[in-house]
């Protein structure tokens, strides 16, 4: 029985044949389908086709994330996260320096790298540019960032200005300031929900969490970092506005009305029991709020010394001398309030030279009579009824 070749389907008449994939082949038919080189020692197959080692790994092996070409098993590679790179492809995108193992680098777009020196120098340049354009715009995203975020309408800040004013301000900013660099990044609703949930859990996520969010949402790492920065800034502004509103509400709140003093003074629960509650604890005759006594801390002078019974303490009720006779006592009623007090300079003082004791009225009318006429102080600016408690005081001792 004739044996046919699996490659050319012709009968094999050669002395030697090759058995590949459990089928007979001519020696010349066992070759790579890509480069047509003869496979004498080793071959690789996929979908019934034969490949050499180089072409097989080039087409079906791991690809370099930099050049997107296949990586041969004999090639030296470097790994960054889940990506594999050729040594020549693992370079800084700014200075094209080949990055070595253990060197600090910054990943951009998952397959581009920047060495530490170039990143720090670029950050310093960005800070200078930010300071130069800060007078032109105060938007949350700086114009030097490569990607800028446009949140949904639910995430826009509440402001008192209308949409027309906002559009006009944006046009003025674009005309007066430098043009923004890089495209704007639009965050979809599902991506926004994922970022919001992550912000509630950790307002300041670590690099590992940001990497997970980048894999879940498909967004750039830089976009996620800037979104979290803007969200934290927005939370701080909202807290400041709420605190300012609370202070403003407390400041403009209506003032409390002051209650009259007299109503509280006559409350027996506050001032204690007594017929005349304001002076309920004072045991003595009351001569009104305009009394003014001469005070001698070391005793009265020798020429003016008198016994307690002969000390004249009497208020003037008018100009001139007081004639002997009863003087009607005046007691403040419940509706009357003493709101104006006489100053010390306007209060008449008793003359030290007056003599004659005061005697209580035996009829119990609450008045007083003077035995001889009393000279009064030469002060005609004050006149009025003499204030004296009524008979409800129950005590007529002169002091």
From Swiss-Prot:
Subcellular location: Nucleus
GO terms under cellular component: nucleus
Basic and acidic residues bias spans: 151-167
Biological processes annotated in GO: eye development; forebrain development; neuron differentiation; regulation of transcription by RNA polymerase II
GO function terms (MF aspect): DNA-binding transcription factor activity, RNA polymerase II-specific; RNA polymerase II transcription regulatory region sequence-specific DNA binding; zinc ion binding
Zinc recorded as keyword: yes
DNA-binding region: 180-239
Membrane-spanning residues: none
Domain LIM zinc-binding: 3-61, 62-125
Disordered: region residues: 136-185, 301-399
KW ATP-binding (keyword) present: no
Keyword annotations of the record: Developmental protein, DNA-binding, Homeobox, LIM domain, Metal-binding, Nucleus, Repeat, Transcription, Transcription regulation, Zinc
Name under which the protein is recorded: LIM/homeobox protein Lhx5
Species in which this protein is naturally found: Danio rerio (Zebrafish)
